[in-house]
């Protein structure tokens, strides 16, 4: 039987060497240390504007509905692997109401835990070792982390204020796009707050179709 010392010596997968501690985790520690130092000198704390963490209560109706649902025995079993039909339909209705987009709740909607899970699953599904990925700069750090974990090659493209924080399509066309499988975009944009338009999405779709690139908007 393996001893504890033997287990502790097992090396993690080599791919983990390509990723570091999550960017925002590091930053929160830096801010905490900075504020502790400032507090020791009687100075005001630094206000963290880096993460949009909710600080308000959900609507009372939502809390009551959750409590009522939690008391129903049938709600504590494993759910469908593709999500409850009612939930998928609600997502489809929301997209239709807000964006005028028609989605098939059976084949075009997949409920997930959050963006990190979705980004990694998409990367695992479409990227082989050595495939290339277009990642925005500045952009959400998880795009690069997931790409490194699947051993893809990261190609960054710049987002500039003078261009409204949109991709520079002329610059993209000058890049070597051979082997690029995925282009990550993010609108409303993090961290700039820039919004997209129908024109931008139309250009992204056209760019993806012409170059055989999967456009993934987070």
Where are the language model's segments positioned?
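Conserved core of the PLP fold type I
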Residues: 71, 75-210
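Active-site glycine-centered loops adjacent to acidic/histidine catalytic or metal-binding residues
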Residues: 218
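N-terminal small-domain helix-loop-helix segment of the aminotransferase-like
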Residues: 4-8, 14-114, 121
């Amino acid at each position: 039987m393996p001893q504890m010392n033997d287990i502790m010596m097992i090396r993690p997968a080599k791919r983990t060497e390509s990723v570091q501690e999550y960017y925002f985790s590091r930053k929160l520690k830096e801010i905490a240390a900075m504020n502790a130092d400032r507090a020791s000198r009687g100075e005001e704390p630094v206000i963290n504007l880096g993460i949009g963490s909710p600080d308000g209560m959900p609507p009372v109706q939502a809390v009551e509905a959750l409590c009522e649902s939690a008391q129903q025995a049938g709600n504590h079993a494993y759910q469908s692997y593709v999500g409850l039909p009612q939930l998928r339909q609600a997502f489809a209705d929301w997209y239709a109401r807000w964006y005028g987009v028609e989605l098939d709740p059976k084949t075009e909607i997949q409920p997930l835990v959050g963006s990190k899970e979705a980004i990694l699953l998409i990367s695992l599904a479409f990227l082989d070792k050595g495939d290339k990925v277009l990642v925005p700069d500045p952009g959400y750090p998880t795009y690069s982390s997931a790409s490194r974990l699947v051993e893809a090659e990261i190609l960054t493209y710049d987002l500039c204020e003078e261009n409204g924080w949109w991709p520079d399509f002329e610059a993209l066309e000058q890049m070597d796009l051979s082997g690029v499988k995925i282009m990550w975009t993010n609108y409303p944009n993090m961290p700039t707050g820039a919004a997209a338009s129908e024109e931008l999405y139309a250009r992204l779709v056209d760019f993806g179709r012409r170059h055989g690139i999967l456009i993934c908007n987070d």
